[in-house]
Amino acid sequence: MGGDPAGATALGRYREDFDALPEGSLTVLNVVNTRRPMAGTPEKLIHLMEGMERHSRQKVTGFVNNTNLARMANADDLRDGYEVVREASERSGVPVLYTTGRPDLLEQFLAEGHDPKFIGAPMPIQTYMHRDWETFTREGL
């Protein structure tokens, strides 16, 4: 789940359905972008996660470090996000299951030798969202 407690409330409606699943079969991911003000520190991230858990009535089972600034992202974003998510993971006991990023940035970040325990599975992604019309008309999708 991502977003905030208000957005997580919609998941709470499905609690009975989730409770009917075999124990351990539901994975609830907290997709984290530490460049967003509400998740920029370990304290803020844990507070946000606890609010989402309360409103969704589900426990987060893993973090996804998705720290980015869209097309302006660089390896520093992944590195900074790693530090925040690592500390939040250590404090909360919630494991880091994935780290996402553009392939070039992810490769650079992984080459730095960070603790794999707080990276999880690397997941290369492409950015398709355009922040402005000019970029879209110049570059297309």
What are these regions (language model features)?
Residues 1:
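Conserved nucleotide-sensing/catalytic segment adjacent to the nucleotide-binding pocket
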Residues 4-119, 132:
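Conserved catalytic-core segment of NTP-binding enzymes
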Residues 118-141:
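C-terminal accessory extensions appended to soluble enzyme cores
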